[in-house]
Curated annotation (Swiss-Prot):
The gene is glyA. Pathway: One-carbon metabolism; tetrahydrofolate interconversion; Amino-acid biosynthesis; glycine biosynthesis; glycine from L-serine: step 1/1. GO terms for biological process: glycine biosynthetic process from serine; tetrahydrofolate interconversion. It is an enzyme of class 2 (transferase). CDD domains: SHMT. Homodimer. This is Serine hydroxymethyltransferase.
Length: 417
């Protein structure tokens, strides 16, 4: 390679990933086929517009690629409509929100510190800057969504749009209850399933596709695809909405919001990678993979509970859980730094009603999607949990060095996808 500096850095990242236990809930490992597609010659092609409606010539091949990705996404989720062009989940959310409501309208989303996402109404996001944002949270007692409280807040603020979904919530969300609430206040419903898309596609969690007006997702995380976004619609795809002072079908409004509304040319090499990932997710072994993700996550959570830790909401229904570090008297930031020293990666995370600054936090978030992609089973996951607990409890530098050696020896025996 001519650029030896850059490619040496890439090799360093290869080594880091191979010798590291990856517990960040929003990360995963793609297949070699996905990497091949994303690293292909398709990165050369500019293709503003949509299949058969491009602003450039020479798009007949990428038209077929995007159409294939759309077809597979629709099949995977049982959707009537799919847009595979969003570059990220945040951009998918921006386009979906703008297709349904206009700037200044009211939105109701999950409080960020209770497990929501920046794009669900945070003041530092477009969703809180350009819209009148309100929030709902979890019950102080159960640390789960209180749907009666959501209904009460919705009736008080009368939102134009309700967003259901989360980035650090370990329980299954009842999308039908959210739709009932939305209908009661004449609001649209947007479901953001970025974290649980793989569980929904395989039937382990209830699907919002025919419940919500629009559903958004990322294509990485539990879908094991390239980093990117996705917008889906079911039976509501052809309803008429007021977009840009014109009556449009919802799917047409979404298309316009993605391009030219929020993006220019699509990333055709990434869309090809999405197509590969959707095909892989349609295979029977992907359902087995998701089953193992859930099993591994539960096993780790149970291990922490048995060691005296408090798990937010008492457990997990999906691929992640939150650990309250109060028993140790350390912060999430402390834990993140210590664990990185022993080749374990996760992230500090606020817990509901957290008294600490978001840059410090009282908890950590742990996910099993990535380690499961490397072939770890339930017993392996319990061993991983013990590595984490050992590192968090020790005060010895020598013990941390030993844990790091143990971690490298253990995880290096599992192949990268």
């Amino acid at each position: 390679m001519i650029d030896s500096i850059l490619f040496d850095l890439i090799e360093r990242e290869v080594k880091r990933e191979k010798e590291n236990i990856e517990l960040i809930a929003s990360e995963n490992f793609v297949s070699s086929d996905v990497r091949r597609a994303v690293g292909s010659i398709l990165t050369n092609k500019y293709a503003e517009g949509y299949p058969s409606k491009r602003y450039y010539g020479g798009c007949f091949v990428v038209d077929d690629i995007e159409s294939l990705a759309i077809s597979r996404a629709r099949e995977l989720f049982g959707a009537n409509y799919a847009n595979v062009q969003p570059h990220s989940g945040s951009q998918a959310n921006m386009a979906a929100i703008m297709a349904l409501i206009k700037p200044g309208d009211r939105i109701l989303g999950m409080e960020l510190s209770h497990g929501g996402h920046l794009t669900h109404g945070s003041k530092v996001s477009f969703s809180g800057m350009f819209f009148d944002a309100y929030s709902y949270g979890v019950s102080r007692e159960s640390e789960m969504i209180d749907y009666d409280d959501v209904r009460k807040i919705a009736k008080e603020c009368r939102p134009n749009l309700i967003i259901a979904g989360a980035s650090s919530y370990s329980r299954e969300i009842d999308f039908k209850k959210f739709r009932e609430i939305a209908d009661e206040v004449s609001a649209y419903l947007l479901c953001d399933v970025a974290h649980t898309a793989g569980l929904i596609a395989t039937g382990f969690h209830n699907s919002p596709i025919d419940v919500a007006h629009l559903t958004t997702s990322t294509t990485h995380k539990t879908l094991r695809g390239p980093r990117g976004g996705l917008i889906l619609a079911g039976r509501e795809s052809s309803i008429i909405v007021n977009y840009n002072n014109k009556e449009r079908r919802l799917e047409d409004a979404v298309n316009s919001c993605v391009f030219p509304g929020t993006q220019g040319g699509p990333l055709m090499h990434v869309i090809a990678g999405k197509a590969v990932a959707f095909r892989e997710a349609l295979m029977e072994d992907f359902k087995d993979y998701i089953s193992r993700v859930i099993s591994n996550t539960k096993a780790m959570a149970e291990c922490f509970i048995s060691e005296g830790f408090r798990i937010v909401s008492g457990g997990t229904d999906n691929h992640l859980f939150l650990v309250d570090l109060g028993i140790l008297g350390i912060t999430g930031a402390d834990a993140e730094k210590v664990l990185e020293r022993v080749n374990i990666t996760l992230n500090k995370n606020a817990i509901p009603f957290d008294s600490k600054n978001p840059s410090v936090t009282s908890g950590i978030r742990i996910g099993a999607a990535a380690i499961t992609s490397r072939g770890l089973n339930r017993d392996d996951s319990i061993r991983v949990a013990h590595f984490v607990i050992r590192a968090l409890k020790t005060k010895s530098e020598d013990e941390l060095k030993k844990i790091k050696r143990d971690v490298i020896e253990f995880i290096s025996s599992f192949d990268m996808p």
